[in-house]
């Protein structure tokens, strides 16, 4: 018997990407597809690329329509998913692609999101190292509630986590700059996302430690490092529809810097990800490009040592809608249900 799945928020980019992946999942039967303001519309009017689901009608975004499924994906703005999730049955696997359940500390949530904290769920980044040589996927095997990471934190955490897990990096001097495609800002019409504003131009935003993903990045790195990690994070809007390129740098521990070559430092990342199907530390001299991961759940990483400054430089690329959102959601679902982790996620990147 197939697994019945409902998707809430199906008219947006994240919800549409969840449906795209589920449409190719061999163990899934797509049930209710819901939306808020677009309820009653044909899915094909809003997600024209989803041909096999085009004639499905979007139902009202209500608990009544979502309950009764084995799995519910919530692809909703922050604040909305927490309210619905609290009313869903405990036996339903609920996967929140929004921000509501990512942060551990209520104070951090209130500071950056300016609303009441909905609580914390297990973090849906399976490859993230946790205590005693384990991975976050162990936390996902026995849960019915999963918080999908933000797209920027996904690229940043996967870039730096191996170094912090190995005790190779200092916690007080971490700088992360990420360039993202416009789909990361959602579907709502905004002047700064118009083609005439974006094409041929790049611009930073959320500068000065105010971007909402900053505490999530610090939370993830701190949990890996076992101490408080402070991050300077700057996001940049790039003239592309999807993809994230992150350049993350951190000071290497002085004693390690004296005793370790650049090749040995890089090997920390190679060893950390050698058994991970979706994460690829590229051959030396090959730098990751967003094009290579578009539409896929894969991650490209390269590591270098700046010997002059004593900093490690890690570049990572993801598709913000796939590994950065929907791919992580489906991957986490597979783990929680005891399925093969790569089901519905075997697509390779699209190039050129």
From Swiss-Prot:
Its EC number is 1.2.1.38. It catalyses: N-acetyl-L-glutamate 5-semialdehyde + phosphate + NADP(+) = N-acetyl-L-glutamyl 5-phosphate + NADPH + H(+). GO terms for biological process: L-arginine biosynthetic process. Gene3D superfamilies: Dihydrodipicolinate Reductase, domain 2, NAD(P)-binding Rossmann-like Domain. Pathway: Amino-acid biosynthesis; L-arginine biosynthesis; N(2)-acetyl-L-ornithine from L-glutamate: step 3/4. SMART domains: Semialdhyde_dh. Catalyzes the NADPH-dependent reduction of N-acetyl-5-glutamyl phosphate to yield N-acetyl-L-glutamate 5-semialdehyde. Belongs to the NAGSA dehydrogenase family. Type 1 subfamily. PANTHER family: N-ACETYL-GAMMA-GLUTAMYL-PHOSPHATE REDUCTASE, CHLOROPLASTIC-RELATED, N-ACETYL-GAMMA-GLUTAMYL-PHOSPHATE REDUCTASE, CHLOROPLASTIC-RELATED-RELATED. This is N-acetyl-gamma-glutamyl-phosphate reductase. It comes from Renibacterium salmoninarum (strain ATCC 33209 / DSM 20767 / JCM 11484 / NBRC 15589 / NCIMB 2235). The lineage of its organism: Bacteria, Bacillati, Actinomycetota, Actinomycetes, Micrococcales. The gene is argC.
């Amino acid at each position: 018997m197939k697994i019945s799945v409902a998707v809430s928020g199906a008219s947006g980019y994240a919800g549409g990407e969840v449906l795209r992946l589920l449409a190719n999942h061999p163990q899934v039967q797509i049930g209710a597809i819901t939306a808020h303001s677009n309820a009653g519309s044909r899915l094909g009017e809003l997600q024209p690329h989803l041909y096999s689901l085009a004639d499905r009608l979007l139902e009202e975004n209500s608990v009544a329509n979502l309950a009764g499924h084995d799995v519910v994906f919530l692809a909703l703005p922050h604040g909305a998913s927490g309210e619905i999730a609290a009313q869903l049955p405990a036996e339903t696997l609920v996967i929140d692609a929004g921000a509501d359940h990512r942060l551990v500390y209520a104070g951090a949530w209130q500071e950056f999101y300016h609303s009441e904290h909905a609580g914390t769920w297990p973090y849906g980044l399976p490859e993230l190292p946790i205590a005693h040589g384990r991975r976050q996927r162990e936390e996902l095997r026995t849960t019915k509630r999963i918080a999908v990471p933000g797209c920027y934190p996904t690229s940043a955490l996967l870039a730096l986590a191996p170094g912090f897990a190995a005790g190779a990096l200092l916690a007080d001097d971490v700088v992360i700059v990420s360039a993202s495609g416009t789909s990361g800002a959602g579907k709502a019409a905004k002047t700064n996302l118009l083609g005439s504003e974006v094409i041929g131009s790049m611009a930073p935003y959320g500068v000065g430690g105010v971007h909402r993903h900053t505490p999530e990045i610090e939370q993830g790195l701190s949990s890996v490092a076992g101490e408080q990690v402070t991050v300077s994070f700057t996001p940049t809007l790039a003239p592309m529809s999807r993809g994230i390129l992150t350049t993350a740098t951190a000071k290497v521990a002085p004693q390690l810097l004296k005793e370790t070559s650049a090749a040995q430092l890089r090997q920390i990342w190679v060893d950390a990800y050698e058994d991970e199907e979706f994460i690829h530390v590229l051959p030396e001299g090959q730098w990751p490009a967003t094009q290579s991961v578009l539409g896929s759940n894969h991650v490209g990483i390269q590591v270098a040592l700046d010997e002059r400054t004593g900093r490690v430089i890690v570049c990572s690329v993801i598709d913000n809608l796939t590994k950065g959102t929907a791919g992580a959601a489906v991957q986490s679902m597979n783990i929680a249900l005891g399925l093969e982790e790569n089901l519905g996620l075997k697509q390779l990147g699209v190039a050129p």
